[in-house]
Amino acid sequence: MDKNTILEFCFFGDRYQLMALKNPNKLVKNKQVKAAFNVFMKHRTTLSATNYMAQIVENFEQFLEYIHDKLQPGKLLALLFKNKQFLGWFCVGQWGNMPVLSFWIDPSQQQSGVALETISFFLKYYQRTLQPRELVWSFYESNQRSRHLANKLGFPSLFYFKKAEPNAPKVYFGTKDFKGESVIETKPYLGWGSGWKVNQMLKPTKNLTVNLINIGFDAYADSQKALLAWFKTHKLTKGQVEVFFNYELCCLCISYNHKQSWVVYSFQQLLAKR
């Protein structure tokens, strides 16, 4: 796409518009994009995940530059509208070798089912079209809503992904078995906020060899305590804990190998080992 593209799709008879922006950093003067960003900034104090971006992004131009700088060629910023009302935004692109899909839904729209329907649509769409070997999912959501939506979609707020072999399914979600392979068991209430039970998060199984686990993290003190307790339980060193807290997106990447040992990498270290 060389210019903005308006796509239309339906959920249960309701018609939505998707504005796909090929070059978001060049659209500072676009009124709809500016309105979308205003909504983003308006709700930033109520969303723990969004707060982090708001600290980096102080104005609209910086927001677009932030998105543009992080996504390599082939990037796409999509803004979702219904009846000219902004509902949320999506980004798809790559960080290093990793395909990345991120989204944010306006909290005022979540009770209407729009968020659930939209997430379902994009999940199926990008699985079908991108077919990434691994997918890192950044979940820009609020505490209870993120868990509720994730549960309704059939997987917990803790997203994890199995490195696919040739001709194997590209992405694994939830706690379902697939062709006899058990995935990691997780608790359905895990997600953003202070309700984490991090020491109960991960139960490795024998059949998995490599897993990349992307855990959203916010700055609540009790979440930090729970995370530290989890690290202690798994006998990880203080240096490895620091890697987690220094991780650029406030996320944790863990590599789990066949020897059942846990190794924590920074994002850059993880890419280097690939």
Swiss-Prot record:
Gene3D superfamilies associated with the record: 3.40.630.30
InterPro entries given in the database record: Acyl_CoA_acyltransferase (IPR016181), GNAT_dom (IPR000182)
Chain ranges of the N-acetyltransferase domain: 39-179
Stored Pfam families: Acetyltransf_3
Alphabetized GO MF terms: acyltransferase activity, transferring groups other than amino-acyl groups
Descriptive protein name: Uncharacterized protein MPN_027
Species: Mycoplasma pneumoniae (strain ATCC 29342 / M129 / Subtype 1) (Mycoplasmoides pneumoniae)
